[in-house]
């Protein structure tokens, strides 16, 4: 069974500055961690920008930062960070995690949040980083999903794979 880690809550990390969010995105999108058979396993939703923007951590950060400035939000927390880890037995093909990751960020994007993913395959246990903006781009309200609600929806997506 995949493990869902709620990084903010489990490790008491806030991503209190824009630079913290930018550093997180750059770490997650690192090509040495996300490259698989010539493809980068990263992305962002909901925007329909060209792929080179959606796979660039600095561009993704600019989308999120613009959203914060629209609401005059200059103090964090700025993002929710989730990590979904798989054992070697659970994940035989790294490329299959891309569609799982896209479905997970669609869950957040469909509810009005900019969300990004990065699949890391450079470790024994493959894992997906999910980074979600704290402000809704639709109505500028703060992130308000309970842990149970997120967990049950992510698990439902994982059970479909």
Spans of features found by a protein language model:
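N-terminal nicking endonuclease/strand-transfer module with a His-rich metal-binding environment
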Residues: 1-161
């Amino acid at each position: 069974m995949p493990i869902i880690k709620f990084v903010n809550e489990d490790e008491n990390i806030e991503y209190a500055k824009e630079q913290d969010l930018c550093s997180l995105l750059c770490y997650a999108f690192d090509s040495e961690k996300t490259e698989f058979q010539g493809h980068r396993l990263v992305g962002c939703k909901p925007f329909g920008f060209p792929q080179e923007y959606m796979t660039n951590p600095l561009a993704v950060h600019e989308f999120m930062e613009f959203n914060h400035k629209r609401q005059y939000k200059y103090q964090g927390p700025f993002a929710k960070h989730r990590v979904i880890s798989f054992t070697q037995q659970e994940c035989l093909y790294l490329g299959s995690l891309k569609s799982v990751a896209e479905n997970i960020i669609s869950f957040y994007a469909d509810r009005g949040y900019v969300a990004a993913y990065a699949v890391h395959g450079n470790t024994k246990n493959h894992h997906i980083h999910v980074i979600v903006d704290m402000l809704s781009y639709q109505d500028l309200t703060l992130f308000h999903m309970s842990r149970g609600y997120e967990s049950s929806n992510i698990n439902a997506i994982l059970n479909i794979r």
